Amino acid sequence: LSQNAFLAQIYHKPGVLTRRKPSQKELEDIEFGLPIARKLADMEIGQTLVVKNKTVIAVEAFEGTDKAIQRGCEFAKGGCVVIKVSRTNQDYRYDSPGIGPQTIKTLIEGGASVLALEAERVMVVEQEKVIKMSDEASLTVICI
């Protein structure tokens, strides 16, 4: 059985989860990066993309989400948008893409401004902590 069936409360519908809303420029970066992230995920390259000023800064590969975020934030010098998606044919019985407090810590340390998650397809574990940490750092978390 799919994990989604039992964990529906940690897969969010579209909307902003934090107090800070994305700027118009950040929304444009999300719009630019989302189709790229989906394509890369479907090619089984990675599920995380770092974008700034409509430029791809980093792509997740074998190293995993946190390392891709660290690398992207380092090159972007902060203020970047991080997009996390799932594959179109994601098998949720075995693998559920997700983020949690460690991801948020990595984003904050790197100076990212937005985390955009694919709505109802990327899980948020320890949600209250994720939102509290993000709000305290003025990091936007949005489900798209």
Question: Which functions belong to the PLM regions below?
Answer:
Residues 105-144:
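C-terminal binding/interaction regions
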Residues 1-104, 108:
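Conserved mixed alpha/beta catalytic, RNA-binding, or beta-rich assembly cores of soluble enzyme
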